[in-house]
Amino acid sequence: MSDQQQQQPGQDGQPFFNIQRVYLKDLSLEQPNSPHIFLEQEQPTVEVQVDVAATQLAEGVFEVTVIGTVTTKVKEKVAFLVEAKQAGIFDIRNVPVEQMDPLLGIACPTIVYPYLRSNIADTIGRAGFQPIHLAEINFQALYEQRLASAMEEAQAAGGNGGIVMPDGSKATH
């Protein structure tokens, strides 16, 4: 056996990224018009909303949550409403500050989202409805859209504003 201490990942100064855990944080299903809604013959309308949130839990440890809401209506009556939060805990160390936000807003949600899709489809199917398989999401395009929108809002609010990165510098795009 060696007397050398074994270094923990990320302690050598090299960028380190690890998925600690992916888990279902919250799931709810509402069927306010069951069982009568099952007798309707009309095609339902489906509305899907997806959002992303990130929280720092400890130094180098982050939780990224992808929130999905699916509302299905038949003749303006809600057939079902599913709300789910799928989360992941990630170890992220020695990553340059300017890369953290895209990592948390693009890479992590891309890892978590397939689990959310599966859980929502499974829940809808188990509720007695045809499963709805959510489309793939380009989280980079979504991130860039939100960044542009936030910059527009900041400029409209103060004229000289902008997004401030974690290191205090202003975002350049």
UniProtKB/Swiss-Prot annotation:
Q: Which GO terms describe its molecular function?
A: unfolded protein binding
Official protein name in the record = Protein-export protein SecB
- Function field: One of the proteins required for the normal export of preproteins out of the cell cytoplasm. It is a molecular chaperone that binds to a subset of precursor proteins, maintaining them in a translocation-competent state. It also specifically binds to its receptor SecA.
Q: What start-end ranges are recorded for coiled-coil regions in this protein?
A: none
State the gene name recorded for this protein: secB
Tell me, in one coarse class, where this protein mainly resides.
Answer: cytoplasm
Where does the UniProt annotation locate this protein?
A: Cytoplasm
Q: Name one GO cellular component term.
A: cytoplasm
What's the subunit arrangement here?
Answer: Homotetramer, a dimer of dimers. One homotetramer interacts with 1 SecA dimer.
Keyword annotations from UniProtKB, A to Z: Chaperone, Cytoplasm, Protein transport, Translocation, Transport
Q: Which Pfam families match?
A: SecB
Which PANTHER family does the record associate with it? PROTEIN-EXPORT PROTEIN SECB, PTHR36918
Q: Name one GO biological process term.
A: protein folding
Question: What Gene3D superfamilies does the record tag this protein with?
Answer: SecB-like
Which family is this sequence assigned to?
Belongs to the SecB family.
